[in-house]
Regions:
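C-terminal structured "cap/appendage" subdomains that terminate the fold
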Residues: 208-229, 237
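Transmembrane beta-barrel wall of Gram-negative outer-membrane proteins
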Residues: 1-71
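C-terminal outer-membrane beta-barrel translocator/porin domains of Gram-negative envelope proteins
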Residues: 41-188, 192-202, 239-249, 256-261
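Outer-membrane beta-barrel "beta-signal"
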Residues: 219-221, 226-227, 233, 248-262
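Residue-level recognition of beta-strand termini and adjacent short loop/turns
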Residues: 22-24, 124, 224
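Short, glycine/charged-rich beta-strand-loop motifs at protein surfaces that mediate ligand recognition
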Residues: 202-208
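A generic structural micro-feature
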Residues: 7, 57, 209-211, 248
Length: 262
């Protein structure tokens, strides 16, 4: 269909300042403030198209402020974060603001509060249990870059970060990691994963909500504290609005991830 000829390109920049209030061997307190800018270019059959700006591009931005807390005690460690989002209309042109307003989105009134909590339990020297939860509540309609997403590295494994998102939402994850082989430079881990979440949005055209979850079994290879290679099997569940997700190889099938840390 026509959607096969539709492509997009995204550019995003984010700058942040962090203030460290307290740091010791057991806990850490900090606050942060940052600004994000996002630009989306749309193409149909290789040609730019959009009614919201010249050249087929849309641009938005927002400010983010919040605080972080982390601690560890014995075999447990945890960290928590709270933040607030405020849309910045100065990133968009007058025409783009007019088009956004037609869908009920006013960047100057786009606001949200969110937070996350993660807990790690080191059962013994080879087994670790990780639990995580996060959520966001929007007080008005948000621009796309301010939304809460269920995918990407911080969410459900195997789910693209932009696949399911909404103004408000929540997410929970649990992962058990067993390091069954290690030497001075490398380690092999086996890790079952389970997670699920829900997002919702309100627009002038109507309301939207979606729920999705995924389970996985992963084999992870770590080397020299730089390389991280994951290979496993992913299976989705609790798919509501987009049941065809379960038929995709990307949604139910082989999952790979390669990461290098500098």
């Amino acid at each position: 269909g026509a959607l096969r000829n539709l492509t997009s390109r995204q550019f995003q920049g984010y700058g942040q300042l962090e203030w460290l209030f307290k740091e010791s061997s057991r806990e850490r307190w900090s606050a942060f403030a940052g600004i994000s800018g996002n630009r989306n270019d749309s193409f149909l059959k290789g040609k730019s198209f959009s009614s919201t700006g010249p050249g087929g591009w849309n641009q938005t931005g927002y400010a983010r402020i919040g605080a972080n807390y982390g601690a560890n005690q014995g075999r447990f460690s945890w960290n928590a974060s709270v933040y607030g989002l405020q849309g910045m209309p100065s990133f968009s042109s007058d025409l783009q603001l007019e088009e956004l307003g037609a869908t009920g989105i006013k960047p100057g009134e786009s606001r949200a509060l969110g937070g996350s909590l993660n807990l790690n339990w080191f059962v013994n020297s080879t087994v670790q249990l990780s639990l995580g939860g996060s959520g966001q509540v929007a007080f008005n309609e948000l621009t796309g870059d301010m939304g809460f997403t269920l995918g990407s590295d911080t969410g459900l494994k195997g789910l693209p970060g932009t696949y399911i998102s909404g103004d408000s939402g929540y997410l929970w994850t649990t992962e058990l990691t067993w390091t069954f082989w290690t030497n001075r430079k490398m380690a092999l881990q086996l890790s079952p994963f389970l997670g699920a979440g829900r997002v919702s949005s309100q627009r002038s055209q109507g309301n939207f909500s979606d729920t999705v979850g995924s389970g996985a079994i992963l084999l992870r290879w770590l080397a020299n504290r730089n390389w991280n290679l994951e290979l496993g099997w992913i299976s989705p569940f609790e798919v509501e609005e987009r049941p065809y997700w379960e038929d995709w190889l990307l949604g139910s099938g082989v999952y790979t991830k390669l990461q290098y840390r500098f």
